[in-house]
């Protein structure tokens, strides 16, 4: 596991991110000590048992397709399928790994297709994805020509799922670090920062937006995707307890309110690029995610509402400049 992080340290040592090395190694060492008491050791065993295969065919431009069935023996493919299944649930994807189709809960490729026409080209950029899950979008960012891609997410499982994919496509310019946003110093070095599906989980959304801005170089672009509701700049939903069965949802603003928040913390040229209702085809139970999904979170008699009676999930994409 240390080699994952050592590779990252070496990659940033001579870059505008080098000052991150003042704090990052100690943070990750602390994480390793904490994580060793949970499920991480069993997932590390899964990773160690993945077969060594020379991957020749990779497509991360139109999808995340790593390898073809012919590059593995039948035995290796069965072994890989068994091991990847042990890392369930798989939430963000889909992935194709040497003919194994990982049909994830979310069709994250649909979100990517919605936002891609609206963002600045990623070619040659240094990119950060905050709350990146198991890293599906990291690969798509790299596929668009980003020079260096970093994702952060505090989940041990997401880290190991990412490393399982990277095992078959060992790209030294795509990395995932098991950190929350609160662990980031003011790096002010990224050309583009993505935050998708995180804002409503933060108790202080204004502080969170300021943290996002602090990661961008002057003139860099924020791509923000989050839950919103209909209304004017004074409209914000604060659930009394749960929203769509989630306890950790704190603030769901209207797009107008969110735009105002972003401007208050200093973002410029804030633009609302897309609004889309989350459909039952985009988020659903699959053979790779057998727990409850969106259909279980909505009112069975009126899918325009959550099971608690709030408006059903509506997701917006906004862009802004630091």
Swiss-Prot record:
Annotated GO biological process: tRNA wobble uridine modification
Task: Give a Pfam family name.
Answer: Methyltransf_9
Query: Which CDD domains does the record match to this protein?
Result: AdoMet_MTases (cd02440)
What Enzyme Commission number(s) does the record list for this chain?
A: 2.5.1.-
One GO MF term on file is:
transferase activity, transferring alkyl or aryl (other than methyl) groups
Asked whether the UniProt record includes Transferase among its keywords, one would answer yes
Q: Which reaction does it catalyse?
A: carboxy-S-adenosyl-L-methionine + 5-hydroxyuridine(34) in tRNA = 5-carboxymethoxyuridine(34) in tRNA + S-adenosyl-L-homocysteine + H(+)
Where, by residue number, does carboxy-S-adenosyl-L-methionine bind?
92, 106, 111, 131, 153-155, 181-182, 196, 200, 315
Subunit annotation = Homotetramer.
Family the UniProt entry places it in: Belongs to the class I-like SAM-binding methyltransferase superfamily. CmoB family.
UniProt function note: Catalyzes carboxymethyl transfer from carboxy-S-adenosyl-L-methionine (Cx-SAM) to 5-hydroxyuridine (ho5U) to form 5-carboxymethoxyuridine (cmo5U) at position 34 in tRNAs.
State the protein's name: tRNA U34 carboxymethyltransferase
| Source organism per UniProt | Pseudoalteromonas translucida (strain TAC 125)
Taxonomic placement: Bacteria, Pseudomonadati, Pseudomonadota, Gammaproteobacteria, Alteromonadales
């Amino acid at each position: 596991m240390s080699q994952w992080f050592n590779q990252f340290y070496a990659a940033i040592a001579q870059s505008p991110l080098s000052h991150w090395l003042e704090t990052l190694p100690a943070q990750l060492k602390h994480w390793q000590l904490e994580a060793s008491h949970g499920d991480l050791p069993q997932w590390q065993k899964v990773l160690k048992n993945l077969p060594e295969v020379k991957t020749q065919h990779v497509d991360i431009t139109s999808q995340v397709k790593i390898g073809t069935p012919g590059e593995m023996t039948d035995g290796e493919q069965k072994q890989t399928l068994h091991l990847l299944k042990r890392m369930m649930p798989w939430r963000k994807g889909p992935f194709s790994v040497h003919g194994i189709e990982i049909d994830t809960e979310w069709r994250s490729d649909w979100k990517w297709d919605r936002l891609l026409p609206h963002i600045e080209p990623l070619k040659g950029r240094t990119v950060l994805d905050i709350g990146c899950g198991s890293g599906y979008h990291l690969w798509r960012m790299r596929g668009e020509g980003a020079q260096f891609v970093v994702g952060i997410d505090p989940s041990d499982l997401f880290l190991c799922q990412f490393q399982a994919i990277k095992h078959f496509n060992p790209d030294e310019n795509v990395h995932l670090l098991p950190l929350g946003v609160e662990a980031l110093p003011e790096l002010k070095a990224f050309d583009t920062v993505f935050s998708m599906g995180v804002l409503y989980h933060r108790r202080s959304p204004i502080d969170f937006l300021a943290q996002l801005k602090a990661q961008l170089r002057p003139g860099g672009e924020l791509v923000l995707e989050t839950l919103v509701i209909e209304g004017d700049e004074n409209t914000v939903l604060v659930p009394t307890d749960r929203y769509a069965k989630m306890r950790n949802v704190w603030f769901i603003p209207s797009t107008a309110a969110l735009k105002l928040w972003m401007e208050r913390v200093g973002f410029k040229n804030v633009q609302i690029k897309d609004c889309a209702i989350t459909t039952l085809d985009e988020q659903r139970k699959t053979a790779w995610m057998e727990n409850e999904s969106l259909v279980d979170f909505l009112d069975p008699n009126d899918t325009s509402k959550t099971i608690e009676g709030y408006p059903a999930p509506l997701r917006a994409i906004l862009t802004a400049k630091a």
